């Protein structure tokens, strides 16, 4: 009898040890533990930590918790800016059999799409789904197991913003990461609109964080104005960019508020938190069967013209009417 009791105790201890070894970072549902309340497991793959993507993830979680209180466990993973890590993360989600994957930024989305054709995938902070997923004549709906939200602001309006704020500008430097397909798309479109206005555009494309500062310096030496699209690598290195452009007195127009803040003059801003919330609302509909993801169109959010008051003051630029100051 003593031997049986001892064996039972050892088995229990081993079971507890194995459970502890298998833990991952999770956000438990409000109002209970994962074992008690969770109905769904959602894997979140975020490319890199920076303000915009962080806000989108936060909005996603908040909206889904509000829609399905006490029913969702979130597994949050950050790829630390490495697309290869995105593949590792989403393959882990697939092996675990999560109920839905939220892919925050384009490399996370493409990794998820490559990993599964069965688990629903919702993207957020994706600039152009057609470009990211190599879809010809993209009509607004991806189909299959993929949908989501886009952070794309009107690119013609961005080009017009450059000429409205800086009507004397002749040379525009386009600073972006060549490894980000969405950045290439934005740069090509903005170049098309600016060239039609007689403005000379020159690309300054960095491949990774190592050459951001040197390319920013080259852009500053060429340009009257620098344009930076919605670009994750640029957003993660905006301090290095600001340390070059601001002392040189070169104004920058940004594709999104995160890059503009403390670095640029003006932007067409969207709320990444609201973008994430919209994605979370879509997720609730997919998880409960209220909506078929294969027919869900990509959703967008309205942009607000904003300016950075500190940068404008530093560069001696008077803000245009109709622009709201960025709150810090």
Language-model features: locations:
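Bacterial lipoprotein signal-peptidase II cleavage site
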Residues: 19-33
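An alpha-beta-alpha
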Residues: 42, 60, 147-194, 295-312
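Beta-alpha junction/loop-to-helix N-cap segments that form part of ligand/metal-binding clefts
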Residues: 76-137, 231-246, 250-255
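Hydrophobic alpha-helical segments within soluble ligand-binding/sensing domains
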Residues: 129-171, 270-291
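Pocket-lining segment of extracytoplasmic ligand-binding domains
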Residues: 181-250, 256
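Hinge/cleft segment of the Venus flytrap/periplasmic-binding protein
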Residues: 285-328
């Amino acid at each position: 009898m003593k031997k049986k009791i001892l064996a039972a105790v050892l088995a229990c201890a081993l079971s507890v040890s194995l459970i502890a070894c298998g833990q991952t970072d999770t956000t438990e549902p409000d109002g209970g533990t994962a074992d008690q309340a969770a109905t769904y497991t959602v894997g979140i793959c975020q490319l890199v930590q920076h303000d915009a993507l962080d806000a989108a993830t936060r909005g996603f979680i908040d909206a889904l918790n509000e829609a399905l209180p006490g029913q969702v466990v979130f597994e949050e993973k950050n790829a630390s800016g490495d697309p290869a890590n995105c593949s590792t993360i989403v393959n882990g989600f697939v092996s675990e059999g999560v109920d839905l994957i939220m892919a925050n930024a384009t490399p996370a989305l493409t990794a998820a799409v490559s990993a599964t054709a069965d688990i629903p995938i919702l993207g957020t902070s994706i600039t152009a789904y057609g470009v990211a997923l190599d879809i010809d004549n993209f009509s607004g709906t991806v189909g299959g197991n993929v949908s989501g939200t886009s952070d794309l602001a009107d690119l013609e309006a961005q080009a017009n913003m450059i000429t409205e704020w800086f009507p004397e500008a002749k040379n525009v430097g386009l600073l972006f990461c060549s490894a980000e397909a969405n950045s290439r798309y934005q740069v090509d479109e903005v170049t098309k609109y600016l060239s039609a206005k007689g403005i000379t555009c020159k690309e300054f494309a960095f491949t990774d964080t190592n050459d951001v500062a040197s390319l920013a310096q080259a852009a500053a030496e060429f340009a009257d104005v620098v344009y930076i699209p919605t670009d994750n690598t640029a957003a993660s290195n905006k301090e290095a960019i600001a340390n070059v452009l601001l002392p040189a007195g070169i104004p920058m127009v940004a594709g999104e508020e995160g890059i503009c803040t403390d670095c640029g003059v003006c932007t067409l801003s969207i709320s990444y938190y609201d973008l994430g919330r919209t994605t979370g609302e879509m997720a609730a509909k997919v998880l409960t069967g209220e909506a078929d993801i294969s027919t869900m169109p990509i959703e967008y959010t309205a942009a607000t013209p904003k300016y950075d008051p500190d940068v404008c003051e530093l560069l001696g630029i008077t803000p245009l009417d109709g622009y709201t100051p960025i709150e810090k």
